[in-house]
Amino acid sequence: MTRRWSFLVQCFTFKKKEGVRSRYMSDYNYVEVLQKSILFYEAQRSGKLPESNRLNWRGDSGLEDGKDVGHDLTGGWYDAGDHVKFGLPMAYSAAVLAWTVYEYREAYEEAELLDDMLDQIKWATDYFLKAHTGPNEFWAQVGDGNADHGWWGPAEVMPMNRPAFKIDEHCPGTEVAAQTAAALAAGSIIFKETDAPYAAKLLTHAKQLYAFADQYRGEYTDCVTNAQPFYNSWSGYIDELIWGGIWLYLATNDQTYLNKALKAVEEWPKDWDYTFTMSWDNTFFLSQILLARITKEKRFIESTERNLDYWSTGFVQNGKVERITYTPGGLAWLDQWGSLRYTANAAFLAFVYADWVSDQEKKNRYQTFAIRQTHYMLGDNPQNRSYVVGFGKNPPMHPHHRTAHGSWSNQLTTPSSHRHTLYGPLVGGPNRQDQYTDDISDYVSNEVATDYNAAFTGNGAAVWSGQSKLPNFPPKEKVEDEFFVEAAVMSNDTTSTQIKAILYNRSGWPARSSQSLSFRYYVNLSEIFAKGFTDKDIQVTAVYNEGASLSPLTVYDASSHIYFTEIDFTGVAIFPGGESLHKKEIQFRLSAPNGANIWDASNDYSFQGLTSNMQKTARIPVFDQGDLVFGTLPNK
């Protein structure tokens, strides 16, 4: 073992945080927080879902991603409450999640959540491997942010085109290449113990991506211009070069990468900021903690503590105490847009640094700050509510999230309540006065995102204190009627009956499109046969039709003279993607021969209960590819 590697092992040996766990025992079930936060990433999955998928309201989606450029770019995570796969925040989220395992692997293991966590991270790293189609080519985004944000519906039935955008040596993107290199390098470390070949593969791609990022420099939004309104890299790319270099050093023990990181530090503005924190855009605050531990250099230690002091008790500058804004309720508040994600990020940095620093007063200071802020998010706040969906007291019920909401009409007001529980995400959070409204339309305060939960997940691991995870979690959601018919009587007399029927696809477990839906209308022709006529004499005609074919009457029970007409929408795509897209109407008439006064609908199975008002009826059963999916059939 080299001296340098021995030093590295001494610095980064996994340690039980017994002091933290025993000190911060509380009424909060931290492992439940951790369990649900991890599950959130499963809800964000794009692509072909495995049999192990635990959410019955999520299905395959984005299966043609990359088809426009001739590559398989399926997989990865949807960014937030939308369905774009933005490369920069996805890579950041994966890197931070891997870092939480690096720091708190033992906590994940003891909580019996390590496998779940690794599974979520692997979903992202698998995608990065697909997106890295050449040493100097990486597909940095799939989906048009503008088109995506203009539609409100479940991921499984997205109707818009999803173009792919790349970076290469002709049009580079240092931020996303270096950030992805960091995610893959960190991934190679945490997977080495359980899957060494996979870890080696991740490391190979990490090296290539970092070399690409370093050699061909440029801001990625100059090439992936579609990302600019959503994830512009305001901090530039130097911070990602530092961050990526550190993780490659940790993964390889190659001094070259540490030297590259330290060289990039010299390109960082000399007046190192201390009034912000880590984010998808700024990875300097993460990097300086790792550099403090690796190098023990005074500049990194002082900069880290200056930042953590600013967030906690205050930093003395020129005889004046500088401190972040605190809400009346005690939240360290940086910015309105996703206020809690910044606080969660700062808390994670405090946990990590407190676990390393030897000064007991500083250790206590940073731990106290981190745990208080975490508890604020879990319920210790003036609103007396949890800010984690599906957890605690009075949690958010209306997060800004398309698939969880489950609209069928391309409207965030329909339905009035979410159809699905999106367990685990941290919502944006309150304003500087602790005020918050649980409003689906408020994407500033009530959206969720993969980057919001990354460090927050680590906080759950940092404070885990021996509780047990929830058994049989998540519960399987009860499926509502997904396909059904509403019908009304337009006219009815002794010569004919005219019915208005609307076939609906409001599927959500999961949402899905169908081009093979049909329904049947059953009649009893006893009175027709009694008059010497047969089913062949009954006319079935469409008065108004949105694409269906009507069958002649077909025998169902000859002995009872029960027949049906099948209204078949085969070839017509019906899916929960808009007001006119999720339903199809037909008006049809059943008529006695030659206008004879022998028609009597009162004994018809499907006529029972119908009025002049539209209503759902189980007596008009619905079929998909010939299989009954709604309603009941007449007894034979």
Swiss-Prot record:
Family annotation (Gene3D superfamilies): 1.50.10.10, Endoglucanase-like
Entry keyword annotation includes Signal: yes
EC numbers, comma separated: 3.2.1.4
Span of the signal peptide: 1-25
Catalytic activity: Endohydrolysis of (1->4)-beta-D-glucosidic linkages in cellulose, lichenin and cereal beta-D-glucans
Pfam families hit by this protein: CBM_3, Glyco_hydro_9
Residues annotated as the enzyme's active site: 82 (nucleophile), 400, 438, 447
Keywords: Carbohydrate metabolism, Cellulose degradation, Glycosidase, Hydrolase, Polysaccharide degradation, Secreted, Signal
SMART domains for the chain: CBM_3
MF GO annotations: cellulase activity; cellulose binding
InterPro entries (alphabetical): 6-hairpin_glycosidase_sf, 6hp_glycosidase-like_sf, CBM2/CBM3_carb-bd_dom_sf, CBM3, CBM3_sf, Glyco_hydro_9, Glyco_hydro_9_Asp/Glu_AS, Glyco_hydro_9_His_AS
Annotated localization: Secreted
Keyword Oxidoreductase found: no
Enzyme class (EC, first level): hydrolase
GO terms of biological process kind: cellulose catabolic process
Domain CBM3 intervals: 478-635
GO cellular component: extracellular region
Family membership: Belongs to the glycosyl hydrolase 9 (cellulase E) family.
Cited PANTHER family: ENDO-1,4-BETA-GLUCANASE
Name this protein carries in UniProt: Endoglucanase 4
Organism: Bacillus sp. (strain KSM-522)
Native organism taxonomy: Bacteria, Bacillati, Bacillota, Bacilli, Bacillales
